Amino acid sequence: MIRKSDETPIGRVVATELKPATPHQFHFWTATDTSIGIGSIVKVQGSGVGDQVSGRIVYGVVTDGFAYSDLATPLHDVIGAEGDPAQAAERPTARAEIRLWTAAVLRQIPEEPLQPVPLGAVHVAGDADVAAALRMDGYLNTAQPTAIPVGLYESGGLEAPVYLDADFLLGPEAAHLNISGVSGLATKTSAVEFLLSSIFEHYPAHRGSVAAVCFNVKGPDLLFLDQAGTLDDADRRRYARLGIEPGPFERVHYFAPFKADGVNLNTLRTNAELARTVEPLVWGLIEVLDFAEVLLNRDDIDAKADAFIDFLSDRVVRREFDDGFGGEHRVETFADLERLFRSIFDGLEMASRGDIWRTHHIATIRKVRNRLGNVSTRCKGLVTDDGPASDLPWGRFDDRGVYVIDVANVDPLGQDLVFARVVSKLREHLERRDLGVDAVVVFVDELNKYAPADGVDTYVKKMLLDISERGRYLGLVLFGAEQFRSQVHRRVVGNAGTQVFGRMDSDELATPGYQVLSPATKIKLATLPVGELMVRHPHFTQPIFVRFPRPSVLRGRDGVERFPPAADLPFADAVGLQLVRLDPRVRTNQVKDLIAGHDEVDVRRALAAVRRERPADVLAMLRKRLGVRVGSEPARERSSVQPLGPIAEEPY
């Protein structure tokens, strides 16, 4: 239902020599009991002489307010009451009081010629006025609308839907969203959850398909998006007003690395009712070698080491390779790489050929060997020494699907690796247009940590900068959140076409980036209630306050209470649970009997192969794989790697 503005004026524009009306700002007075407040949208109807003045309509948003009386100085009021406040309240004649408001211009119709705001009556804006003031009519009431509901503008009993333009939110005209606010009170995660549900329901069909990849970096924040939350009547009314059907996300896919034991998942979503929906995230040498820059200390790796790593990536990995000493190798895992290194060192020692192999000095080779050999130890559970990988479904992304990667309990090095590889793979597939969807929203919280304004340029920071500057052309959209916007890299927040602010810290509002806001607007930002946001969008010439309904998904802390995480299982039980996820017909006792007496390393390899191939008969394949090396080559005799002897000239 479209609600029209009240034809009864609530105020009138005034212009004096000290406070004139300009093309971008005007002042108006109202009665003292008005419903107008900071953030209210008003409409001015020109009533002067001439067609341009009488037909001109101006929309504005209130940015400040003042109250006046006829007092020239406070001393007069004190003397009039004889210094007694009680007598002032009993005076027979009340002093005249005026409410004066300052408003910033949102839009003028016609837009040319641009002139000062005319003197005229001021009205409260209705639904159609809000749409016109925010220029939403250009993408809302068209043959192919691109409007995405972001919330409700509320003022004086009016609830008017506010929409964002999908072309400026998800590209190609502009893209990216950034949301700032204090932790816990700004509802940043809730706002992103609601906006994703709005995008999934209202993203125009002619723009193609869309999915979301969310990195869970804090506790259980994003671990229950497939579970329904609790809504009250006010939330349901807001959903209906915005044209959104409340409910949890229908296609949610969860991924998490293993813990150090290699069988228990490193996530809080381990309750028996939900654990089957979490897929392992495990990578090997092939997956991580291209991201050696993330894993290795750049102060410790020089150009020679970089050149040798590139040689391994281009000439050795996944190829039949002759080490020059009569040995044939096919390197696909860290264990294979260790065997190659051992062959090189033994060959050089036996052949007495000095300290150069394929133009690379032995000290450089030892250095790279030591650094790469530590990767699987430092990222244990995420990176495997020997075994197949378990990855996201590249090329098979679902339309309106949400892919949650839980790295909340992963060490910082592992988090950096996950961010770098996942986003890089997204970009590669979007460039080739074979991801399965046309656009992807990447949600990253804690930008203060991953893209700080100061400090060294890490791989993750450079990756986020690349998304914010060039991602919109590919359909790769960054939704970022942080507590302190002033401490995030300027190019990351500056390239966000849509900027959202929740409740802000007063110290943050005192930084130079907020000087464009009026003092009254800053005060409102510092005291915003939960569920209210200030939104800046390319179509909005001024920030607008909106209220959004509570997300219709289970909040993280409520989800942990309803679905308490299970304790880590013993090795055999954890293996059984992994197989039950693949085939509910499997019984844990069968698995225990099958793996009894086998080495845990062999069981992990066999389990990884079963997860990768997902056969019809899970137990039969596990039985076949046990005791057989899982990989691309036949089983070899297992030999322990002897420690390298010290070398006098070894500088590392």
Which functions belong to the PLM regions below?
Residues M1-V182, S190, L195-S198, H202-S209, ...:
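Basic- and hydrophobic-enriched, low-structure N-terminal and domain-boundary segments
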Residues D33, G48, F66-Y68, I109-P110, ...:
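Conserved nucleotide-binding/hydrolysis micro-motifs of P-loop NTPases
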Residues V78, D226-A240, R269-A272, D457-V460, ...:
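Short secondary-structure boundary/capping segments
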Residues Y153-H253, R490, V535, A567-D568:
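Glycine-rich phosphate-binding loop of nucleotide-binding enzymes
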Residues L177-N178, I405, F479:
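Conserved beta-strand position immediately N-terminal to the Walker
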Residues P204-V210, C214-F215, G219-L225, G247-D466, ...:
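P-loop NTPase motor domains
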Residues Y459-K461, L465-S552:
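Conserved ATP-driven motor cores of ASCE-family P-loop NTPases powering translocation/secretion/packaging/pilus
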Residues G531-G597, V601-V610, S632-Y652:
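Conserved P-loop NTPase motor module
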